[in-house]
């Protein structure tokens, strides 16, 4: 009995039995930086997504056809923050403002804020991040971006409002860094709760 409990605690502390390899990547890189996974390289139009079951990066398909953005290419590297869970059941989306990088890569990212849209009346947050050593390394908040590079936010707002069918993505407001980090932390806690629930629901084999 005690050995069963001991094994349970070991597995419980090992990221709650990650369902795929991506889940093993930590939420934070350090105190001030998060990890970020690139699904779509900046300057490209093909839709790629992580398969939730296998953790493999695959071309996104709809009705048997590969999806390609019918608009201008992505204005930055696009992907997600691992070990988060948003309202639609997917990880938190993030766009990286620095140079284009190959898809399927992880990088450390400094979150500076977010843009709040609604998609079919559902909340859709698009988080904004910069590399701590890149072009925007001195930008630490969305206020800095508004002051130093206001056109960047206008580009992001216009792009996300337009890359789907007109009127589908409705812009509501910009979100400052403090609120964005709170939303991000809540999304991580939600991911942890789900993993814990999944673990508890899976009985372990008895070891004599």
Spans of features found by a protein language model:
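Sec-dependent N-terminal signal peptides
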Residues: 2-13
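Hydrophobic N-terminal alpha-helices or hydrophobic patches in metabolic proteins across all domains
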Residues: 16-208
